[in-house]
């Protein structure tokens, strides 16, 4: 082990001379934490660009230096390893899931360059590592590993290097399981997807590698969930839109989610952009799919989605519930959500508080493509769209949609990224789930 280094604080940077005689600077914004070793020695863990000469590089690796003494300016960075990573009495089982297919494609690199070194630095030697082989891997892992441990009362922490899909797959398996949960697993998100709605909503947006600070400084909070029950003929859309599958193996036809349920423009965009025809265009597929929905190539106006929407509301836990149907039967955008953000800057529900369990409804009716784009732009400007007269924004307990569309493509519903094609004259009911079976580190 090399000798600890002498350091100085210069402005907002840490200055030191390496053992090779090179003068180095660490920006405070790049410091992850300070570990207390044997006083007075401390270790500074910090991010370093993997290509130091490329200022636009977004790839970082985690490095460590041992220092002789702790400057006062570094005191706020000192942490104690949290119990969800290391506990003297009953150590949790640490499981890392690396989703190789998630949006940015960087999950494996982030694990190798950042997460694995972190485990080494904090002395975490025993952990299980899983890399996804297909879209079914996380669900299979949950049924074979995570559920059994939760049922047997084994404390466990699941670190997901993935998009929202990894969390949704775990959630689905837990809520569809018939076994009782004795100890809820703690889930930590290291977001590697494109939207990362849950991670962005709970504030995992800071630092070179979002989510890592929360893993070290956060604590568990239970995750609120909604249940989406579909009419019996509804089918999951799979294989990039080419095939259909049963929603579940029982008669309930129910999916579970923690982020968003939508119909109309949002659901159609998610569904179309995930089809074989669009996926071959890579990241451009979202823009192309949106363009076709807003400016159809046959020259017609944007589609008017037909259906009856019924909202159930309540003024408080002990208050009676009331039902009210939306007057209009034609819609452009209808969405229920438990979170404020669908993307980092896309504030769809500004009144939402992460993990508080309140469901909110956002809707607007048929309008021109230009007016719809204006509303979406306002959502990127601090959620100002909800102040427009054309937008319905309300706190709800439940929503039911009875579809009145002939074509299947206008009867597709999005549940946390999964697409369901509802049968003709079918319906969906989305309501808040009472039980909370999973915890999120935040």
How does the language model describe each region?
Residues 1-161, 168, 172-179:
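ATP/NTP phosphate-donor binding region
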Residues 16, 215-218, 289-309, 340-341, ...:
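Catalytic phosphate-donor-binding core of small-molecule kinases
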Residues 50-55, 67-75, 397, 404-442:
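Generic C-terminus detector
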Residues 60, 101, 105-112, 142-143, ...:
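Short coil/turn segments at secondary-structure boundaries
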Residues 103-106, 137-139, 166-168, 195-197, ...:
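Eukaryotic short linear interaction motifs
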Residues 179-336:
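Catalytic core of DAGKc-family lipid kinases
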Residues 254-261, 267-270, 332-337, 360-363, ...:
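Short hydrophobic-aromatic micro-motifs
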Residues 264, 271, 331-369:
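Active-site beta-loop-alpha substructure in enzyme catalytic cores
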């Amino acid at each position: 082990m090399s000798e600890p280094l002498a350091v100085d604080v210069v402005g907002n940077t840490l200055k030191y001379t390496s053992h090779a005689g090179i003068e180095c600077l660490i920006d405070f914004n790049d410091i992850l934490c300070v570990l207390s070793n044997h006083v007075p020695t401390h270790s500074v863990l910090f991010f370093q660009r993997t290509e130091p000469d490329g200022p636009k590089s977004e790839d970082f690796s985690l490095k460590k230096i041992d220092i002789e003494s702790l400057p006062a300016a570094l005191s706020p960075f000192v942490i104690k390893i949290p119990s969800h990573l290391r506990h003297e009495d009953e150590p949790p089982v640490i499981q890392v899931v690396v989703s190789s297919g998630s949006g940015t494609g960087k999950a494996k690199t982030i694990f190798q360059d950042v997460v694995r070194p972190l485990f080494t630095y904090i002395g975490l030697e025993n952990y299980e590592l899983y890399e996804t082989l297909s879209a079914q891997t996380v669900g299979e892992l949950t049924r074979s590993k995570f559920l059994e441990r939760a049922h047997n009362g084994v404390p466990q922490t699941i670190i997901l290097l993935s998009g929202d899909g990894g969390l949704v797959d775990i959630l689905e398996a837990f809520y569809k399981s018939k076994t009782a949960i004795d100890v809820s697993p703690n889930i930590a998100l290291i977001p590697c997807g494109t939207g990362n709605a849950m991670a962005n909503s709970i504030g995992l947006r800071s630092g070179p590698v979002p989510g890592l600070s929360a893993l070290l400084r956060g604590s568990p909070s239970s995750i609120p969930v909604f249940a989406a029950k579909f009419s019996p003929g509804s089918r999951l859309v799979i294989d990039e839109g080419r095939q259909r599958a049963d929603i579940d193996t029982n008669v309930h036809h129910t999916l579970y989610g923690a982020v968003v349920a939508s119909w109309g423009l949002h659901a159609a965009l998610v569904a179309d952009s995930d089809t074989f025809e669009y996926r071959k265009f890579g990241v451009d597929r979202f823009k192309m799919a949106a363009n076709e929905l807003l400016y159809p190539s046959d020259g017609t106006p944007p589609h008017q989605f037909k259906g009856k929407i019924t909202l159930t509301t309540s003024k408080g836990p002990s208050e009676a519930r009331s039902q009210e149907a939306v007057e209009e039967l034609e819609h452009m955008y209808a969405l229920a959500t438990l979170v404020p953000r669908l993307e980092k800057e896309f504030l769809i529900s500004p009144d939402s508080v992460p993990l508080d369990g309140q469901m909110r409804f956002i809707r607007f009716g048929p309008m021109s493509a230009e007016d719809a784009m204006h509303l979406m732009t306002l959502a990127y400007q601090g959620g100002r769209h909800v102040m427009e007269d054309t937008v319905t924004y309300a706190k709800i307990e439940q929503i039911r949609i009875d579809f009145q569309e002939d074509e299947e493509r206008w009867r597709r519903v999005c549940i946390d990224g999964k697409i369901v094609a509802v049968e003709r004259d079918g319906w969906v009911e989305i309501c808040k789930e009472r039980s909370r079976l999973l915890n999120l580190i935040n």
